Amino acid sequence: MEATTAQANELERRVDLSIAIADVEKEMEQRLKRMGKNMKVPGFRPGKVPFNIVKQQYGDQARHEVLSEELDRVFGETVTEKKMRVAGYPRIEPKTTESNSHLEFSAIFEVYPEFTPGDLSGSEVERPVLEVSAAEVDKTLDILRKQRVSYADADRAAAKEDRVVIDFTGKKDGVPFPGGQANDYPFVLGQGMMLPDFENAVEGAKAGETKTFDLTFPADYHAKDLAGQTVQFDITVKQVQAPVLPELDAEFATSMGIADGDVTKMRAEIEANLKREVKRRIEGKLKDQVMEALLKANPITVPVALVDMEIQRLMQAARQDMEQRGMKVKDMPIQPEWFADQAKRRVTLGLILAEVVKTEKLQASPEQVRTMVEETAQSYEHPEEVIRWYYAQPQRLQEVEGVAIENNVVEWVLSKAKVTEKAAVFDELMGQKQ
């Protein structure tokens, strides 16, 4: 066996491999003899099949297997000797040669980039600061009450947040159009279930009232035959129901999982949950900025092979997600280019994070993993069961360990970067509409 190496570009390498034909033929003969011992051919006793018949039937298979194994061995020895970190799989190409004693091949592959983590002293990170107040607890309670709203008949004109039940018929040029009719149709005013002009026409009407009005569909309306068209609706309001929010009492507290119905305990639990969520959101904001800082400080070239593999992984995840949603994947072809940028970013960050962790020794400790598991478990009704669930499977702990390592990297970057604090607005941080 002989091997030479060459550098094609920044990450691509070529290894020229030379394999002795005699070695291949020798191993091939030994393999065929072993196969012949178990071969059954009519007219011959088991294990007594002539070698030429064994070779005729299995020679090509044996030669392919031996050559493949020899190439793998020679390639592995070469890259190990040269201390090359191979990214992906090599492409093996036969070479034209006049040699009668050797088979010549080229293995083309990529290697991992070698780099030293860049300087982060000039990076700027903004740390959101927010203390959960009684006002946030009250606002959360209001949201929870609205999620449990009931409705009662109201003898008045319909207003926003009321639920109305109507019959309606839509006509275009005096003719009812498909999808434009319904009876006993309920919806809540102000939730955007109907077009704004439709809701405006219903608002102010009382039960038993009938109205006729014109409505122009938006130019980008999903039904192309109605987009931009003006139609006429006839409606009859059958019910107007006002929202009734549950009282903040023991019954409500019990419905929220407080066994003894203690409202004070309920508020304390909501506050604790909000603090955990605020902490998680702030950590997420910091992490996003840290990752951007790492990308900016480390403009590395990444192996195309790794990006292609990540694209395939993302495509498979997208297919599974679509299937879980009841969608037919075959009817919605997924294109690799949709995931190219995301895949390249993920691969780049993965390589940078791995190098930072190795260089700065930022591996997660068992104590750190345990703390994270316990913190996660606190948001469940039976924390001890959740902790046992995590420790029952090594893979679950590995996922937590991965997050812990990322947290270590975030803290390390924050120790190097210029960090300024900025007061955060609760609704903005939580992604809620004001």
From Swiss-Prot:
Keyword Chaperone: yes
EC number: 5.2.1.8
Coiled coil stretches, renumbered: none
Molecular function via GO: peptidyl-prolyl cis-trans isomerase activity; protein folding chaperone; ribosome binding
Domain PPIase FKBP-type: 161-246
GO BP term, example: 'de novo' cotranslational protein folding
Entry-linked InterPro entries: PPIase_dom_sf (IPR046357), PPIase_FKBP_dom (IPR001179), Trig_fac (IPR005215), Trigger_fac_C (IPR008880), Trigger_fac_C_sf (IPR037041), Trigger_fac_ribosome-bd_bac (IPR008881), Trigger_fac_ribosome-bd_sf (IPR036611), Trigger_fact/SurA_dom_sf (IPR027304)
GO cellular component: cytoplasm
Keywords noted in UniProt: Cell cycle, Cell division, Chaperone, Cytoplasm, Isomerase, Rotamase
Subcellular location: Cytoplasm
Reactions catalysed according to its record: [protein]-peptidylproline (omega=180) = [protein]-peptidylproline (omega=0)
Keyword field contains Hydrolase: no
Main location group: cytoplasm
Listed Gene3D superfamilies: 3.10.50.40, Trigger factor ribosome-binding domain, Trigger factor, C-terminal domain
Function: Involved in protein export. Acts as a chaperone by maintaining the newly synthesized protein in an open conformation. Functions as a peptidyl-prolyl cis-trans isomerase.
Classification via HAMAP family: Trigger_factor_Tig
Notes concerning its domains: Consists of 3 domains; the N-terminus binds the ribosome, the middle domain has PPIase activity, while the C-terminus has intrinsic chaperone activity on its own.
Family of this protein: Belongs to the FKBP-type PPIase family. Tig subfamily.
Name this polypeptide is given: Trigger factor
